[in-house]
Amino acid sequence: MTQRMKRNANMLKALHSCSKNDQKMLLKSAKPDLINAICDCLTNVVYGKIPISSQMKTKLRRKKKVLKELTDPKITTVRKKNLLVQHGGGIITNALGGIAKFLLGL
């Protein structure tokens, strides 16, 4: 787990446990460090470093194009923030569900 994810562990836990409307409000006011931490989590899930259930994989497969943009290091943080605000609900809940056990250990 990266230092960025450790610094933002409390916010990641809050994003995982709150409703979609609350997630959207938190993401709109999020700092770039939190956006990058979320993208780090997504990168770890996409590349298989963090195991997730097959049910979560099928849900994330529907958002394949958005996931590619969020995990691309060439895309700016502002663009990633806009993508997360627009498509964030399902992506964040499913991806952070996979790393919840790691976050709870912090």
Whereabouts are the PLM-identified features?
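N-terminal leader/propeptide segments of preproteins
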Residues: 1-31, 35
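General helical secondary-structure elements
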Residues: 2-3, 59-60, 97
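Generic structural signal of hydrophobic/aromatic residues within well-ordered alpha-helices
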Residues: 11, 23, 38, 60-63, ...
